[in-house]
From Swiss-Prot:
The active site is at 68, 133 (proton acceptor). This is Succinyl-diaminopimelate desuccinylase. Keywords: Amino-acid biosynthesis, Cobalt, Diaminopimelate biosynthesis, Hydrolase, Lysine biosynthesis, Metal-binding, Zinc. Pathway: Amino-acid biosynthesis; L-lysine biosynthesis via DAP pathway; LL-2,6-diaminopimelate from (S)-tetrahydrodipicolinate (succinylase route): step 3/3. The gene is dapE.
Length: 375
C-alpha cells in the first residue's frame, strides 16, 4: 500500500521511541516541515526533546502530539515485532500506530498538502511536538508552554492528535478533560506488639472511619460537559509483614478526577477538614497534574465537527471523559483545545493497531480543519 501517511507512520514506528527517548522521530518530522517552509525551534529540556515549528503569521492553529510510546511488553506475544510495522487485513500493527504516530504522520502530510494548495495562507500554522507525554511529562509540553507564554506567543487554536475515537474515526471528539489531583497521605500511629495494644496506637484502626467516610462522599453531580467527580483509592500500605506487629504508619494514596464544578483547593479543604474531624495525626502531600479545561462551541469545535461530518458522515460526540492529555497544559495559553485522533481500542496493548484507511481519512480531516481556520 503506497500512501504518504502510511509510509510516514511506518517510518516513525520503526524508531523505538520509548519515553522520553525520541529515537530520531522528531528529526524526521522536522525535515519534512522545513521542506515546506516551516521555521523550527528545538526546545529540549533535560532528557526530553521538543520542538515548536511555525509557518505564516496571524491567527494561530497548532497541531500538538508526542513521539514517545509506552513499552511494548512481551514482544513474543505480538503477531509481529512491535517496532516492525506490518499491515494485515488493512490494519497497521506496531507500537505507536494509534498512540500516536499515526496522528503525527497525518498531521504532517495534511500540512504538506495544505501548504501546496495555500502557499500564502492568511493565518499561522504551527506544531508543538514532545518526546515525553507517556512518562512523567515534566520536561515536555508543559515546559514548552511555559517558554511560549513567557514570550507572549499567540496560540488561538490547538488540535491534539490523541486517539479520541471509539469505533470509527471522529465518532468522539474531546473538547475538554477532567482535572487530576493525587493525595499521598500518611497516618501516624505508634508501633507495638499486637498482644499489647494499649502500648501502641494502630493507625489502620484510627484511619478506618475516616476512609469509610471519604469513599462515601458525593463530591458533585457533574454538569452538562463533565461526569461527576470520581475519587479512587489507588494504593494502601501498612505493617512490617509480620503478624505480631501493630504498624506505626498507614500510607494511603488516592486520586480525584474532578469536573469544573470543583477546584483543587475545594477538594483539599474538604479532605483536611475530614482528617481534623477524625482527630488523626498525619502528613499529606498533594500532586496536581492538571486542571480541568473545557472548549465550548466556537470556531475550532465547529471546524472539527464540520471535517468529521464531511468525510465520515457522522456527527461526533463532544466528550470530556478519559484520562489527562497534554491539552491541559496548552489550555493555559487561552487557546481553544480539541482532541481528534484514531480509534483507541488497542492503545498501550499487545498488538496495537490502527485501520490504515483511518489514517488517510484523518489526514483529510486535519487538512480541512486547516483550510477552515488559517487558509
Amino acid at each position: 500500500m503506497s500512501c504518504p501517511v502510511i509510509e510516514l507512520t511506518q517510518q516513525l514506528i520503526r524508531r523505538p521511541s520509548l519515553s522520553p527517548d525520541d529515537a530520531g522521530c522528531q528529526a524526521l518530522l522536522i525535515k519534512r516541515l522545513q521542506a515546506i517552509g516551516f521555521t523550527v525551534e528545538r526546545m529540549d529540556f533535560a532528557d526530553t526533546q521538543n520542538f515548536w515549528a511555525w509557518r505564516g503569521q496571524g491567527e494561530t492553529l497548532a497541531f500538538a502530539g508526542h513521539t514517545d510510546v509506552v513499552p511494548p511488553g512481551d514482544a513474543d506475544r505480538w503477531i509481529n515485532p512491535p517496532f516492525e510495522p506490518t499491515i494485515r487485513d488493512g490494519m497497521l500493527f506496531g507500537r505507536g500506530a494509534a498512540d500516536m504516530k499515526g496522528s503525527l504522520a497525518a498531521m504532517v502530510v495534511a500540512a504538506e498538502r495544505f501548504v501546496a494548495q495555500h502557499p500564502n495562507h492568511t493565518g499561522r500554522l504551527a506544531f508543538l511536538i514532545t518526546s515525553d507525554e507517556e512518562a512523567s511529562a515534566h520536561n515536555g509540553t508543559v515546559k514548552v508552554v511555559d517558554a511560549l507564554m513567557a514570550r507572549n506567543e499567540r496560540l488561538d487554536y490547538c488540535l491534539v492528535g490523541e486517539p479520541s475515537s471509539i469505533e470509527v474515526v471522529g465518532d468522539v471528539v474531546k473538547n475538554g478533560r477532567r482535572g487530576s489531583l493525587t493525595c499521598n497521605l500518611t497516618i501516624h500511629g505508634v508501633q507495638g506488639h499486637v498482644a499489647y495494644p494499649h502500648l501502641a496506637d494502630n493507625p489502620v484502626h484510627r484511619a478506618a472511619p475516616f476512609l469509610n467516610e471519604l469513599v462515601a462522599i458525593e463530591w458533585d453531580q457533574g454538569n452538562e460537559f463533565f461526569p461527576a467527580t470520581s475519587m479512587q483509592i489507588a494504593n494502601i500500605q501498612a505493617g512490617t509483614g509480620s503478624n505480631n506487629v501493630i504498624p506505626g504508619e498507614l500510607f494511603v494514596q488516592f486520586n480525584f478526577r474532578f469536573s469544573t464544578e470543583l477546584t483543587d483547593e475545594m477538594i483539599k479543604a474538604q479532605v483536611l477538614a475530614l482528617l481534623e474531624k477524625h482527630q488523626l495525626r498525619y502528613t499529606v502531600d498533594w500532586w496536581l497534574s492538571g486542571q480541568p479545561f473545557l472548549t465550548a462551541r466556537g470556531k475550532l469545535v465547529d471546524a472539527v465537527v464540520n471535517a468529521v461530518e464531511h468525510y465520515n458522515e457522522i456527527k461526533p460526540q463532544l466528550l470530556t471523559t478519559g484520562g489527562t492529555s497534554d491539552g491541559r497544559f496548552i489550555a493555559r495559553m487561552g487557546a481553544q483545545v480539541v482532541e481528534l485522533g484514531p480509534v483507541n481500542a488497542t492503545i498501550h496493548k499487545i498488538n496495537e493497531c490502527v485501520n490504515a484507511a483511518d489514517l488517510q481519512l484523518l489526514a483529510r480531516m486535519y487538512q480541512r480543519i486547516m483550510e477552515q481556520l488559517v487558509a
